[in-house]
């Protein structure tokens, strides 16, 4: 899932 990379900035 790309969600991990998107949430990585948080």
UniProtKB/Swiss-Prot annotation:
The keyword Transport applies. It is found in: Secreted. Keywords: Pheromone-binding, Secreted, Transport. GO terms for cellular component: extracellular region. GO terms for molecular function: pheromone binding. It comes from the Eukaryota. Its main location: secreted. Binds pheromones that are released from drying urine of males. These pheromones affect the sexual behavior of females. Belongs to the calycin superfamily. Lipocalin family. This is Major urinary protein 2. It comes from Rattus norvegicus (Rat).
């Amino acid at each position: 899932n790309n969600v991990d990379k998107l949430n990585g900035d948080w």
